Amino acid sequence: MTNETSTADKAETTDETPGGSKRPGRTARHWRAGFLRGGIELRHLLRNPKEMSGHLSNVVVALLIGAYLSDDVPGTHTPMAHLVLAGFAAYLLFQIGLINLPQILVTEREEGALLRLRATPGGIPAYLIAKCLLVVVMATGTLALLLAAAALLVDGPLPRGPGDWLTLLWVTTLGLLAVVPLGAAIGAVLPNPREALALIMLPTMALLFTSGAVFPITSLPVPVQQVASVFPLKWMAQGLRSALLPDSARAAEVAGSWELPMVALVLTAWTVLGFLLAVPLLRRAARRESGSRLTARHRRAARSGAMPA
């Protein structure tokens, strides 16, 4: 990472203040260090045109598709463009948690970030807090941009009342909680960044087309619906549709309703699973790091012409 992030690593090592005054609680130190590191990484992101353009391009693609579609969802008077925009909103959250975050973690592991965390008291918790902050800001910013641009440019959907805004808030929050720890767990076990992208992209693209995000889920074969219902994207998209589409659009859902209790249950289950996997896998990845491993990876990367920056 950058020199600024290295400064945040060093800041995490401070256990007590000069003069022997009482040091703050461990949890408070983790949160303070995590927010410090997260703030540095956010500034780095905002100053990186390449990374910003990647997120903006996803919004542009969604808007172009929304502008192109003119039919209604079969069996309803809801524009297909509205269903697709709601689905893309869910997919952008899903993508940031399960594609962008693992890539960030794998890249930073190749650069030696996990090795530095081994020598940093409370390094893993602070690191996770920083990544959660980064992902939440990226995701909510992208979602807000998509919804605002869609409403202004292609007559896209927006929540119609306080209840729908509340649904949008809790589905977005719970959806991120479901995918961010899972993305961290995946990033802890994946190989180098190029292979990581290949391994993650195909399954996530398959879920995009089978989870009802870009097609009415009732138009898909029943076995496909059943497989998709295991994964969080289907329920994230369904929850966002409930917030953004009129109640008449429920006719295109499998159960004929939004099933919001099931949305909450499935996303909560994935949240618990993700947290149970993420922390031990990241700790294991940090313990396995060594100077010799890092040097060997850099040599292989140099030979292949993919040396980390």
Predicted segments with their positions:
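Hydrophobic alpha-helical transmembrane segments of multi-pass membrane transport/permease proteins
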Residues: R47-D72, A81-N100, T140-T142, L202-F209, ...
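Membrane-interfacial helix-loop-helix junctions in multi-pass membrane proteins
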Residues: S211-L273
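Aromatic- and glycine-rich beta-strand/loop motifs that create alpha-glucan
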Residues: T2, E12-N58, G291, P308
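Transmembrane helix segments
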Residues: I65-D72, G187-K234
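Junction motif at the cytosolic side of a transmembrane helix
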Residues: T2-P18, V254, P261-A309
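Hydrophobic alpha-helical transmembrane segments of membrane proteins
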Residues: H77-I104, V171-L176, P181, A188, ...
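Transmembrane helix boundary and interhelical loop/hinge segments in multi-pass membrane proteins
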Residues: G97-G122
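Alpha-helical transmembrane segments and their short interhelical loops
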Residues: I124, I129-I200, M205, V263-A264, ...
